[in-house]
Amino acid sequence: MAVGAAAVTEVGDTASPVGSSGASGGAIASGSVARVGTATAVTALCGYAVIYLAARNLAPNGFSVFGVFWGAFGLVTGAANGLLQETTREVRSLGYLDVSADGRRTHPLRVSGMVGLGSLVVIAGSSPLWSGRVFAEARWLSVALLSIGLAGFCLHATLLGMLAGTNRWTQYGALMVADAVIRVVVAAATFVIGWQLVGFIWATVAGSVAWLIMLMTSPPTRAAARLMTPGATATFLRGAAHSIIAAGASAILVMGFPVLLKLTSNELGAQGGVVILAVTLTRAPLLVPLTAMQGNLIAHFVDERTERIRALIAPAALIGGVGAVGMLAAGVVGPWIMRVAFGSEYQSSSALLAWLTAAAVAIAMLTLTGAAAVAAALHRAYSLGWVGATVGSGLLLLLPLSLETRTVVALLCGPLVGIGVHLVALARTDE
């Protein structure tokens, strides 16, 4: 006997509708976008605050060490965002599918807990092989916090996906803000008491407990956390694995780029600290809100499943417009902002900042086409696009050019490979 898929089974409860608005209820409607947009703005400001405090408190040499850990945590949690993407797709798609009433069910939050525990073991167990190359200082503390922080973030990302899939955008935004505020509070305390590098490493991972705080304080969040989706755990994990691989590849370019830069350079030093800060500042205005709105975008593309290429046009135009303004602003006032905000040691050229902003537009476009591919369940194409972009960027970083030039070339040209892969796959589904 088939039942309407909008009836999602909760753990230990009867069927419950997918969100208060139903599956079709406005993933990019003004209300949901406003709530997530506000949360994104707060999150971005908090992220800037942490980076500002670290850059002001640490010299460029020290900031390059912090930047690598910040990037390493961004890399592994970016991969864990594959759980957010797959959970959003699974929950959201229920409004368009019929499922067997007698079929097996999967509890995404429990599965993500197992994934997080497994990730902790893998990172900690393998750390003797790679941590010495990546972490120049506070090596074992960095490994411990990276492992534990990732385990918590797996649950965080899955809970975000369940909230996005059920249109609980207020709670979605609150979870984002809780994560960001916890980070900036720890960073501010570090700045005041002079905890230096170790304190900023703690601040990077401190927000990984936000999911637990939300579960303890928010009944709607607890209701979403109890949801189960149709299908076996193995089926969910297969889809999540593709998303995690692709999200991991995307995280290398988006958050983990300092790690890639470190691995392809003999020594970063003060120049590396300046480049890492420049990359972070130029991409954040585009990529922070875009990454935060992954749930909205995937839900939107699921709703527009018959014309996904056309559905890309409006957000792509918005990204292009914002990017053009950003390039101009970065070239005109960027060097001055870096000197005034972070100190005279952080000297950067107008051309570098403008080109890095253009590179951020390329990665933003790749993020957008990737969200459309996830919504279409094109997991292989999604993975291939991001992996291709990452491999391309990594190879370009090996060119015998200056650090600034090869950084721009890698971040600008590598994403074009992935965009092409995604668009070809999406075009075939629309035929």
Curated annotation (Swiss-Prot):
Any coiled-coil regions, as ranges: none
Main location: membrane
The protein's name in its UniProt record: Uncharacterized protein MT3732
Signal peptide limits: none
Keyword field: Cell membrane, Membrane, Transmembrane, Transmembrane helix
InterPro entries: Poly_Biosynth_Transport
CC per GO annotation: plasma membrane
Annotated family: To M.tuberculosis Rv1510 and M.bovis Mb3654.
Membrane topology, from the record: Multi-pass membrane protein
